[in-house]
Amino acid sequence: MVAFTSCTTKNEVKSSGINYDIMDTTVNPGDDFAQYAAGNWTKVSPKPADQPNWTSFTSISDKNNKLLGELIQGIASQQNEPGSLAQKVGDVYNMVMDSVRLNNEGLDPVRPYLDKINAIANNAEFIKYIASQHDNVLFSVGVGADAKDARINIVNVRQGGLSLGSRDYYLSDEAGTKKVRDAYKQHIVNSYILLGLDEKAATTKMETVMKLETEMAQISKSRLEMRDPEANYHKMSVDELNKLTPGYDWKQYLVDFGYDQTTEVQVSQIEPVQLGCKMLAKGNLNDLKTLYEWQTLSSALDYMSDACVLENFNFNQSRNGAAAQEARWKRALGIENRLLAWVVGQLYVEKYFPAENKARMEELCKNLIASFADRIDAQEWMSEETKKVAKEKLNSFY
């Protein structure tokens, strides 16, 4: 890496914007360029104990979160108009900060949801219920842009049912993945004990969850296979999907899900979705209820008592390596961003992003687009027609 300075007048010197403090110049850049360019980053900016990783981007995010924390703490400490955005944000923050109430309640707030699951009488009722709740038990359903026609949105159906995300965590015997798998098993047991089950009953629940998730993992696509866009795109009618999943009524499922006008879907991974449909339609009902119960319980842990939050943290340590829990106000901020992201964003903009800042950013973007247009004009290998199309695409940026 070479930096030049240029003299424009006798007294004016423009210098490079490169931060030499983070560079490790004792290393030959030809041997290890990453170490050479940023090897001293951890020395000048050590990783906080509550962070799983630390980069210049997470450093900026951390500074931004401190501003956001000050904003929300101020909102939460005042009387806000009932029904206002501020009132919603303040209520969520104060609820998370009320450790006495949360510890007294334990997992009681989630029990009514678990009771509804356990009251389901048959597989058809189970499918109808998970659709009405927009819950993805053995595959994922949602709306997004059509990968081959961004002008339209389409219902996407993808493989799912793996709480650990990757199939490798269930199937690989590599030391790192096995460590996570063993930690996950213990995490399930510990969580059910927090719910009030004894160790034997909790272990039985864990074995059921692992049986179903491992079965899904065996047919799920690997991370490498998921990178092939063509192999993960199968657009079809709902009738065609029904033929691929005998015994599973997609038309009714989509109506119950709230997508009653849907006639076409995009199925990313056909075989895992087929297995998920077969298991939901014809699988052991009690096993399905246990899996859904676990997914519901697991998703609630971060919102419950200190013991529940600590259990979640201890398990996640096996994957992310954070040495300490985040402060409660940071956890509250994270929950705000999960539940009320758009609201928090609006309040942040009102306080920290005035109109003149927006105008500056818009001017910067216009200058960038103009610069790119100049670069297009300078390309000798491009025909005039190609340049015209390139500029049309460029001018569509916003």
Which ranges hold each PLM region?
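Noncatalytic, helix-rich "gating/capping" subdomain that lines the substrate-entry/channel surface
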Residues: 74-363
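Bacterial Sec-dependent N-terminal signal peptides
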Residues: 1-13
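Secretory-pathway/luminal and periplasmic proteins that interact with or process carbohydrate-rich
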Residues: 41-44, 164, 215-225, 370, ...
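Contiguous, non-catalytic segments that form substrate-binding/exosite surfaces or channel walls
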Residues: 217, 355, 359-398
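Extended, non-catalytic structural segments that build the interaction scaffolds
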Residues: 16-27, 168-176
